[in-house]
Amino acid sequence: MDFLISTSLSESTSTSADFCVVCGDKAIGKHYGAVACNGCKGFFRRSVWQNLQYTCRFNKQCNIDKDHRNACRYCRFQKCLADGMKPEAIQNERDRIGSTKRRKRSGANSENNSDSEGTPSPKIEVMGNSVSRKLIEMLLDIEHRLASNQSMNALLRDESEMKNSRQRAVNYLIGWTNMLHPLPEVPLADKVLLLKKFSSAFTLLGTLQRSMALPHFVLPNDQVLSISASHPPELFEALTRIIDELLTPLRRLRTDHAEFSCLKALLLLNPDVVGISNNTRERIREARDALLKTLFAYMSNTQNSIDASLRVSSLLMIIPSLISVSSSIMEFPALSDLFGLGDVIKRDTISPKIETPPLEMKPMMPKIAQPPVTSAPTVPTNIMMNKDLISQIMNNPQLFPLLPMPQTASPPMSFMGQSEFGCHLQSMPVKVILS
C-alpha cells in the first residue's frame, strides 16, 4: 500500500482581521470559513482529514488561547467549530487537489502551507481505515484460528503432554508461519533461516502477552511460573530482566491484542536475515512495509500523528530487547524449556533433523534447579518423526493439519496475500516432537 502524499494548495489571505478567532494568535487569513492562524488552521485540517476523536480531561470548558491552545485538543476543536470553521470546506479542498499520486510536491507551496505550528512540512495521509482495519483483522484471525482450532486444542492439552511448553510453542509458531503472507510461498531454505533466527523471540512474546495482567508468567502449556527471591540468583536475575526490559514497557504502553499480533508478524517478516534469497527479501520487505503503515494507521485512529508515531517507535524498540532477552534465556536449558524457547532447528546442523528425544524432558542445567510448577506426570506417547522438520511441515500440509490451509500451493492474492482457506485435510493431527 502506498502512502498518499500531498501538499495543500495556497489559500487566499485576508487582511480584514489580524487575530485568530480561535486562540487569538496572529492570523494569516481566512481558512475554512473563519479567520485563523497557521497553527489552528493545520490543527483543524488534521482533525477532519484523519477523523480524530478527542476527549477532555476536565469539564469541557478549557481556556483556549495562544499559550494554552495545545493543552486540550477537544476544547480547541470545539472552539474551531463554534467560531465558524467548516469541515465540509476541507473536503472541498481535497476534491480540488484530486489524486495525490499524480501530483508532484511543490516547494513553493510547501513553504506557505503547513500542518504543523511554525515548521512547514508535507501532509502525510496513511492508507485508508478500511484497508488497515482489514489487515489488523486478518492478523487477529490468525490468533483466533490457532486458539480455537479443536484439533490443536485436543493435541496440545493432552494430559500426557501438559508439561511440554516447547511442543506447544513450536506448533503455534508454525501455525503462524503457515498463514502469514508471504511465508507460505517462500523457498524452504529461507523459511529455515527465518525460523532459526526469530523462533525464540516469537515464543517469548506470546508468553509476555499471556502474562500482561498477571503477577506471574503464564507459560505456553498454561502452567504458572511465579517470581520468588528463593529462586537461585541466576534464575531470579533472568526473570527480573524479562520484567524490567519487556513486561514493564509493554504494560506501560498498554499494548493491546492487535499490537501484539503486529509485533509477532514483524518478528517473522524481517528482510535483513543473512542468507535469504533476494526475491524472498524483497517480498518480505514489501509485506513488512505494508504492516508498518497499517500499524501507524491503526494508532492514528485514536491519537494524533505525532503521538501515533511515538507509539509505533516505542513498540519497535521492544523488538531488539526481545531478541536479546530470549537469547540470554537460551543459556539456561531448564528455563528455556519452560518458556518453550528451544530452537525449532538445530543451529549446528546443515541439514536439520528431528532427533529422538529422551522419554522424559529433564533439566540439563545442573547448577540451577528448575522452578516449581504445577504439572501432571509425563507419559511418553509422542509420535516420532525423523525427517527434515521444516520440509515435512511446510511442504506436506497433511503432516500438520492443525490449521485450515489454502486449497492451492499459491492461493489467489488478496490483501497481504491471504485468500479463503479450505477445509481440514485430515482429522487426526500429527505432532512434531523435538529433542
UniProtKB/Swiss-Prot annotation:
**Compositionally biased, Polar residues: which spans?**
107-119
Q: A single Gene Ontology molecular function, please?
A: zinc ion binding
GO BP term, pick one: regulation of transcription by RNA polymerase II
Entry GO terms, CC: nucleus
**What does the function comment of this entry state?**
Orphan nuclear receptor. Transcriptional repressor of intestinal metal transporter smf-3 and genes of the innate immune response. Inhibits nuclear localization of transcription factor pqm-1; in response to pathogen stress, may facilitate translocation of pqm-1, leading to transcriptional activation of genes involved in innate immunity and iron uptake.
The tissues in which it is expressed are:
Expressed in intestine and head neurons in young adults.
Q: Which UniProt keywords apply?
A: DNA-binding, Metal-binding, Nucleus, Receptor, Transcription, Transcription regulation, Zinc, Zinc-finger
Statement: the UniProt record of this protein carries the keyword Transcription: yes
What does the similarity note say?
Answer: Belongs to the nuclear hormone receptor family.
Name of the gene: nhr-14
InterPro entries on file: HNF4-like_DBD, NHR-like_dom_sf, Nucl_hrmn_rcpt_lig-bd, Nuclear_hormone_rcpt_NR2, Nuclear_hrmn_rcpt, Znf_hrmn_rcpt, Znf_NHR/GATA
Q: Which domain of life is it from?
A: Eukaryota
Q: What is this protein called?
A: Nuclear hormone receptor family member nhr-14
Keyword Transcription regulation belongs to the record: yes
Ranges where the NR LBD domain occurs: 131-355
Region called Disordered, residue ranges: 91-126
Where would I find the NR C4-type zinc fingers in this protein?
20-40, 56-80
Q: Which residues bind DNA?
A: 17-92
Which compartments does it reside in? Nucleus
Consequence of gene loss (knockout): RNAi-mediated knockdown causes enhanced resistance to infection with the Gram-negative bacterium P.aeruginosa. Knockdown suppresses the developmental delay phenotype of hif-1 mutants when grown under iron limiting conditions.
